[in-house]
Amino acid sequence: MSRICQVTGKKPMVGNTVSHANNKGKRRFLPNIQEHRFWVQSENRFITLKVSAHGMRIIDKKGIDAVLAQMRARGEKI
């Protein structure tokens, strides 16, 4: 499963884990991706999206129809 948010495009970042002695080692910061089913009233069906917590807030604010329109304008297949 890819760890990319379909709404915001968030993906894993690379950084350092830093010990108390200030030794550094590589690590990945993973986004909070959830697979969530959204009811789309206009299409009368559920749509499953992989979205981050921030992406869910965007959907709450703008509405699922507006977000889907933006995704389709980018050329994403839903």
UniProtKB/Swiss-Prot annotation:
HAMAP family: Ribosomal_bL28. Belongs to the bacterial ribosomal protein bL28 family. One of its GO terms (biological process) is translation. Keywords: Ribonucleoprotein, Ribosomal protein. The lineage of its organism: Bacteria, Pseudomonadati, Pseudomonadota, Gammaproteobacteria, Cardiobacteriales. The gene is rpmB. One of its GO terms (cellular component) is cytosolic large ribosomal subunit. This is Large ribosomal subunit protein bL28. It comes from Dichelobacter nodosus (strain VCS1703A). It comes from the Bacteria. GO terms for molecular function: structural constituent of ribosome. NCBIfam families: L28.
